[in-house]
Amino acid sequence: MARTMAEKVWEEHVVRRAEGEPDLLYIDLHLIHEVTSPQAFEGLRLANRKLRRPDLTIATEDHNVPTENIFLPIADPVSRTQVETLRKNAAEFGVRLHPMGDIDQGIVHVIGPQLGLTQPGMTIVCGDSHTSTHGAFGALAFGIGTSQVEHVMATQTLPMTPFKTMAVNVEGKLKPGVTAKDIILAVIAQIGTGGGQGHVIEYRGEAIRSLSMEARMTICNMSIEAGARAGMIAPDQTTFDYLKGRPHAPKGELWDQAVEYWKTLPTDEGAVFDKEVFLNADELSPFVTWGTNPGQGVPLDSVVPDPESFTDPVERAAAEKALAYMDLKPGTRMRDIKIDTVFLGSCTNGRIEDLRAAAEVLKGRKVADGVRMLVVPGSQRVKQQAAAEGLDEIFKAAGAEWREAGCSMCLGMNPDTLKPGERSASTSNRNFEGRQGKGGRTHLVSPLVAAATAVRGTLSSPADL
């Protein structure tokens, strides 16, 4: 029987199946950070249990960490306690930890692929929504809650009910200036933030196959914003070339065996998806959000929509509420919206290719007066690589702030936040009310749009410069 890639990976990991019960899945890699792990470790301690597979568990500090003055004590007491608790727990339970200042520290969904820990055909979990990022390698990767984190720590398994499958087919070729971020924002605008609910989305088609691994990670990262549990892209030569030689990738004969297995993972000819969606890459242009959820997006050359244009009363009410919060009027040209802060970073767009793309736009230019730009590498390795290429000097010469690795302004859990009423163009993944700080207003954009916006001071693309 023809199977989808998600079905193949799922079946390979079922260790127990009983009628009327969820499947019990084996977990190949467990990623942890300081925010969702403390209660899980405490649960192990109270039950007098050991961590079952420390060798399949890796921890980093990312959500709460400051991105400057990283060797000073963390000012916020809650953040400081969470980081200190992770260090204590990692030492007690034998977990490999990459703390602030470590060369391999960074956002958990950046360092996993970077180290070669993320591989095709794996099951990967983390107490974090954007674990779907790792699906770019053909892994089944999804976020879990704190009680599930403890279950994986104790047993290296997880009881799960099989997901439905959805294919998002993106054919054609992207025009210059249009990126993976624009694809995924267009997908979410088309199917809505609940369109993928209960599904694993497999991204397919010519436009997807032509993307780099880092671009594929951007797309899979935001599957959650489409309501899906996970996102996947079939492994191919691009995947193998990215992984080969990385610290945890198989070596020698084991590499050859791994590649042979990975080649069996793509969806079989004739396999049936529960749902299919189609987009034409030729027709896509830079995309930006105007509202307070990632599905409220339009092409940059469009205008803020009128709530009355929505036939669904729920969507109409959501649009009215969003425009009130964002302080926008229907019919306003997106390019006329002034921006106070530009954030380049996050597990969506904080990798070396993202920094290169933005630096190319900023080279020889200046950040506009009155605009603050934060450039936050997704990991210390990314920061090191950017410095080796001179990208840091380009950012600093343009007037941007060059920071240490971390989640930063993606979420208001660290010192990098918006003030009430401030408006940002952000390469992150969520634009909810208060996401980047209480009263902050967020427009989701690609790195290219972020850089051009920093120069012009209004939402812009490089074509506007």
UniProtKB/Swiss-Prot annotation:
Q: In which domain of life is the source organism classified?
A: Bacteria
Keyword 4Fe-4S belongs to the record:
yes
Report the GO molecular function annotations.
3-isopropylmalate dehydratase activity; 4 iron, 4 sulfur cluster binding; metal ion binding
Pathway note: Amino-acid biosynthesis; L-leucine biosynthesis; L-leucine from 3-methyl-2-oxobutanoate: step 2/4
Cofactor: binding details: Binds 1 [4Fe-4S] cluster per subunit.
Q: Which cofactor does it need?
A: [4Fe-4S] cluster
BP GO terms, sorted: L-leucine biosynthetic process
Q: Where does [4Fe-4S] cluster bind?
A: 347, 407, 410
Which UniProt key words apply to this protein? 4Fe-4S, Amino-acid biosynthesis, Branched-chain amino acid biosynthesis, Iron, Iron-sulfur, Leucine biosynthesis, Lyase, Metal-binding
Reaction(s) catalyzed by this protein?
(2R,3S)-3-isopropylmalate = (2S)-2-isopropylmalate
Q: Where is this region: Disordered?
A: 417-443
Give the protein family. Answer: Belongs to the aconitase/IPM isomerase family. LeuC type 1 subfamily.
PANTHER family per record: 3-ISOPROPYLMALATE DEHYDRATASE (PTHR43822:SF9), HOMOACONITASE, MITOCHONDRIAL-RELATED (PTHR43822)
Q: What's the protein here called?
A: 3-isopropylmalate dehydratase large subunit
Organism equals Thermobifida fusca (strain YX)
Native organism taxonomy: Bacteria, Bacillati, Actinomycetota, Actinomycetes, Streptosporangiales
